[in-house]
Amino acid sequence: MQNYLVINTFVENSNENIRKFSKLAKLCRCSVIDCNFKVIGQSLSIILLFSGTWDAIAKMEDMLEKLEKEDDIVIQSKRTEIGKLQENCIPYAIDIVGPDQENLTFNIINFLLDGDLFIKRVSSSVSESSQTGIKMFTLHMIAHIPSNSSISTIRNEFTEFCDQFNLDAIMEPMK
């Protein structure tokens, strides 16, 4: 039987820290099921989902404790289960680009949740356009739409919503 452990930490951005956390699975004989490394400012955010036998996961937990003490960092970890597939949903990729505005991420997420979509992943950023210097907002999202929903209605309402904020958006089923 497989066991699962999710970890989350925020450390100094360095190749050594990336190597250290990447090496954990090998040392404990676990598999990496999901992996997210992201540089935020001068820091590195790490989220990993490991799977393994009960003794491999126990070894991982011990190594994480040791790593916390040696490197004086905080690592959140929790045993978890893999969620069941949402068979009654259609996965969609959503990409949005436009001028940055206050509360934009919240407004987009709130709109989609109000439409009964299930948000599975969100990544957004703001950067200065090299062409004009304006701050541009980008968002990538994976959402699941219940299969009994009217896709055309959701798409039309989403397009109207994005038009209100002068955002360019693409919403398409994942293959």
What is the predicted role of each segment?
Residues 1-175:
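Regulatory modules associated with amino-acid/nitrogen control
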